[in-house]
């Protein structure tokens, strides 16, 4: 709502912006018309140099990164933006109906409402190198998120050569999902989409790491960001690449 926009010296913050890097399918819904826009996220840069051990065995069919909000296991902010309610529904279908084995990171001590409890493992918080190892040891990653600008675990999973199973309604990160990386699902197509994904994995259809490294990272995304900035201000110093500072 225009009246609710933050004002600085009587003008909308947007009026001071020369260009937007965004994550949206339809940026015009969120960004003022007439401002240059580029589909670019921090996750375009954060995964290309991660250590990948291609010799690790596959121990799990899927991994889900779903940190609990508290020891009472109630849904708070993290559970909301990670979409734990849909994650649990997916896990139930994946393990109870399809017989898949999963590892749920971050929910140690919290119940998961499924019958085949022997088909899931839960962990507490794990250090980043261990998380990457678990991703590599999984056949795919479950990402049910919607309110997510561009989930880091998605591109980290791609860099670990692990395909992705992603909520079609995710706000950002959707651009990484294609016939080289994985599939989308909706709440009504979980079983069907997961079956397609597993069949494709069995037939070696996917090459997620190759896709990510060839289409994102410093050389590709850095060149695109440089060109975008130069289009806004041609007087910027010459350089080969520009990148975001990644956390």
Across the structure, where does each feature detected by a protein language model lie?
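Conserved catalytic-core segment of nucleotide-activated headgroup transferases in glycan assembly
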Residues: 45-122
């Amino acid at each position: 709502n225009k009246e609710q926009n933050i004002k600085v010296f009587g003008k909308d913050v947007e009026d001071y912006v020369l260009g937007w890097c965004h994550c949206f399918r339809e940026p015009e819904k969120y960004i003022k018309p007439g401002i240059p826009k580029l589909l670019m996220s921090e996750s375009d840069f954060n995964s290309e140099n991660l250590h990948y051990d291609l010799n690790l065995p596959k121990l799990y069919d899927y991994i889900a990164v779903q940190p609990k909000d508290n020891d009472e296991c109630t849904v708070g902010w993290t559970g909301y933006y990670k979409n734990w309610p849909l994650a649990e529904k997916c896990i139930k279908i994946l393990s109870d109906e399809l017989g898949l084995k999963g590892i749920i990171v971050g929910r140690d001590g919290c119940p998961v409402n499924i019958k085949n409890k022997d088909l899931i493992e839960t962990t507490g918080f794990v250090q980043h190198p261990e998380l990457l190892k678990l991703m590599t040891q999984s056949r795919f990653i479950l990402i049910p998120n919607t309110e997510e600008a561009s989930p880091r675990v998605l591109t980290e999973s791609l860099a670990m050569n692990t395909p992705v199973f992603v909520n079609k309604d995710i706000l950002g990160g959707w651009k990484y999902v294609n016939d080289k990386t994985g599939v989308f699902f909706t709440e009504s197509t979980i079983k069907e989409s997961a079956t397609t994904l597993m069949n494709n994995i069995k037939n070696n259809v996917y090459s997620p790491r190759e896709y990510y490294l060839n289409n994102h990272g410093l050389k590709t995304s850095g060149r695109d960001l440089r060109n975008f900035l130069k289009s806004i201000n041609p007087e910027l110093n010459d350089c080969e690449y520009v990148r975001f500072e990644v956390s």
